[in-house]
Amino acid sequence: MKRFLLIISAVFSLTAYANSENAPQTTDGAFTTLMIAAADIGKYTETLRNNPSAFQATGTTGAGVCVTNSGNAYEGQMMVWSAFPDVTSALVGGTKYDPQQAPRQFKNLRDLKYGVTWKPLTPFRLEPGYERVQRINVPAENLQAFTEGLEKLEASIQAAGHPNFFNGVFVPIGGGTHEIETLMVRSITRDAQS
């Protein structure tokens, strides 16, 4: 088996809004992420909370931010995410808001890096909380074994007394050279102690 290349890890979700209580795990849906550098992460996050118009314009069913606390590639690294019921809605939503044409209050707080749409390959439950994220290169011939292994790992961790632990494996749609041949693995719990 070819070795896996870990690119970026460790993202902690600061804030999110989504109705996820007892949400089912599903491979339906898609996510968009806008990767940015924020000079003042707290101020940018607060501005997003107070001005949800960008999220509302895209038709998202849930949205939030994740801040990279370790393994970051640049200072102020964070992403703004949005959840959609399907890939089509995510792609169409991306045409309804242009982050490069954002109001000045947003532009002055962040530097855009790139955006990408993600499709889950394994059943995933949207329950924002504490997250660890890895971007991994997996050869195509090993993809099924890799996803099955992560599903078994999730079941084992849940059986060991952590029922709110979830893994998700996502494939990028777009994202340019930043996410090419990369899977995103998100391991999520309600908090770091869970």
Residue ranges: model-predicted function:
Residues S9-A18:
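Hydrophobic h-region of N-terminal signal peptides that target proteins for export
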Residues K2-I7:
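Sec-dependent signal peptide recognition
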Residues A18-S194:
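Short S/T/G/P-rich N-terminal loop/turn motif that feeds into the first structured element of a domain
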